[in-house]
Amino acid sequence: MEYHEAVDFLFDLRRFQVRPGIESAAALRSELDDPGDDIRFVQVAGSNGKGSTAKLTESVLREAGYSVGLYTSPHLETLNERIQVDGRPITDRAITEFVERVKPWLIDRAAAGEPLTFFEVVTLLGIWYFDRQDVDVAVLEVGLGGEFDATSVVDPVASCVTTVSLEHTSVLGDTIEEIATTKAKVAPAGDTPLVTGATGDALDALRADAGEVLTVGTDETADVTVGYDGRVTTTESQISVTMPGGDAADGGISYPAAFADGLDLSARLAL
């Protein structure tokens, strides 16, 4: 099989409609012998800002010395852009090998009336590739909602909901509260809080469903205060962060160097 044939096969899966649930993605993961069991996953959901948040997170983790997988959507030019390891896109050969491996199984599923969607299959392509590359951490951008998204086939060690707004109401719900509740399902197990920039009714719904929540915002009511001072020059931007228990002005909190370096690198790449 050639690369262009593999990609054409994947794109052809777009004809299948999205069905809420992770059962199909879980079945494909099982068929692939459950890749990703040893990977620590970070799941990024939200109505806006998912992609940039995922990339910021990946940048900080890489600066901290981890090998990091990044899964985002959509792509601009090639499918390979969606799946990266340490800043390098997945290879053509890996995509072709994956499609050769799963194509017969996917055809049988479709013939039985249980087809998988493009997003479900590409999500598992990412997880499979991250496993083969032996990454330490993988950052997954949620496609739609959270509870029934293919990325929820894994159990994250950390997750966030950037914002919540009315979107995809036919699938996620008719109100902000319903949509927030669906997104809250990405919350990690245990005592790790769900991180969010949501406010108002959305924040209340997230707290009600996810339990402990760490809020991020631009005012003093947030647990983590972020100030963005705009573009300082044509190549730089300035960001200040204040964490609980410290003040950015008096240096009450000491941040790991990788945190600042990762934010700086990601901001420069975006400009």
What are these regions (language model features)?
Residues 152-163:
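Inter-motif core of Ras-like GTPase G domains
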Residues 140-141, 161, 196:
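Redox-cofactor binding/interface segments in oxidoreductases and associated redox assembly factors
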Residues 85, 89-114, 166, 174-180, ...:
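Adenine nucleotide phosphate-binding catalytic loops in nucleotide-utilizing enzymes
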Residues 22-37, 63-154, 170-173, 178:
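ATP-dependent carboxylate-amine ligase catalytic core
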Residues 1-46, 53-66:
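Short functional linear segments
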Residues 137, 158, 193:
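Short, Asp-centered acidic motifs that coordinate Mg2+ and/or phosphate
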Residues 57, 126, 206:
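Aromatic/hydrophobic pocket-lining residues that form π-stacking "cages" and hydrophobic walls in ligand
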Residues 52, 148-150, 168-170, 203-204:
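Glycine/Thr-rich phosphate-binding loops of Rossmann-like dinucleotide-binding domains
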